[in-house]
A protein has these predicted regions:
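A short, hydrophobic beta-strand/beta-hairpin element that forms part of a small beta-sheet core
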Residues: 41-49
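PLD/PLD-like phosphodiesterase catalytic module centered on the HKD motif
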Residues: 29
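Non-catalytic, surface beta->alpha helical segment in thiol-disulfide oxidoreductase systems
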Residues: 49-70
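Local sequence-structure signature of Cys/Sec-based thiol-disulfide redox active-site neighborhoods
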Residues: 1-25
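Short Gly/Ser/Thr- and Asp/Glu-enriched loop/turn motifs at secondary-structure junctions
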Residues: 36-40
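General small-molecule cofactor/ligand-binding pocket signal
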Residues: 32-34
Length: 70
């Protein structure tokens, strides 16, 4: 399973926290982190957008959204 997290510089710690939580839940997950200058926090499962906003939501909510799609 491939998850990509695209985040603005101010949200880097949130992205790394989400990556850690996903790796704890799914041992086979590959997580790519991509920083951007835009104000954006987006999570993609394979090529589909799971979450996208200009602010962060909690990790459990994003993990729930991913679980709905797998």
């Amino acid at each position: 399973m491939l998850v990509t997290i695209i985040y603005s510089e101010s949200m880097e710690s949130n992205a790394k926290s989400l990556r850690a939580d996903m790796k704890a839940k799914w041992s086979d997950v590959n997580v790519n982190l991509m920083g951007t200058r835009r104000t954006l926090y987006q999570v993609q499962l394979e090529s589909k957008v799971v979450y996208s906003a200009d602010s962060v939501t909690d990790n459990n909510s994003i993990i729930d959204l991913i679980e709905e799609r797998i």
